[in-house]
Regions:
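Iron-sulfur cluster-binding electron-transfer modules in prokaryotic oxidoreductases
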Residues: 1-167
Length: 167
């Protein structure tokens, strides 16, 4: 089972724990947990992609979403995958800190979410990237509210580098 949204993937990987006391769902939930992988995790480990060179090498700042790095324990795989495009993939300073999205956190705790966003954007912009990449839709929305630097889902970049349209 492949997930291209880190929050959903984290939840599916946690089904075994969530349903551990449910006699009807326990075994099925455990199977789902064991089969679930983030799409970047799977692609990095299982496929040799044929990347097409571009006229320019880009600087990509990779934001590891909380649900990805803390929930799924997937951190280096998306960056390794992006590095195969022959671009410069940069880890954001203080990358372990939330961007302020956190599901509904940016709606329920707007002041703190804005402070986290400002800190994240400052750290991103210190790298002077051509664009930002992440695997979480909420983070894409949150970070795009604080910067003019384009932010793309990791799979959008990989699609472009395997012959798809420029995002």
């Amino acid at each position: 089972i492949l997930s291209n949204t880190s929050g959903c993937g984290t939840t599916m990987k946690d089904y075994g724990f969530i349903f551990k006391d449910d006699k009807k769902m326990k075994k099925k939930a455990k199977v789902i947990s064991e089969l679930t992988r983030d799409v970047s995790e799977y692609l990095n480990e299982n496929l040799k992609l044929n990347f097409k060179s571009k006229d320019k090498k880009y600087k990509i700042a990779y934001h590891s979403a909380c649900s990805m790095q803390h929930g799924q324990k997937v951190h280096s795989q998306p960056m390794q995958l992006l590095s195969k495009t022959d671009n410069e993939v940069m880890e954001i300073p203080e990358g372990h800190i939330c961007c302020g999205s956190a599901g509904t956190y940016n709606i329920l705790q707007t002041k703190i979410a804005k402070e986290l966003l400002n800190k994240k954007v400052k750290n991103i912009e210190s790298l002077k990237p051509d664009f930002i990449s992440t695997g979480n839709i909420g983070c894409i929305t949150q970070i795009s509210n604080g910067t003019k630097t384009p932010i793309l889902h990791t799979i959008e970049i990989l699609d472009w580098y395997t012959g798809g349209p420029k995002p």
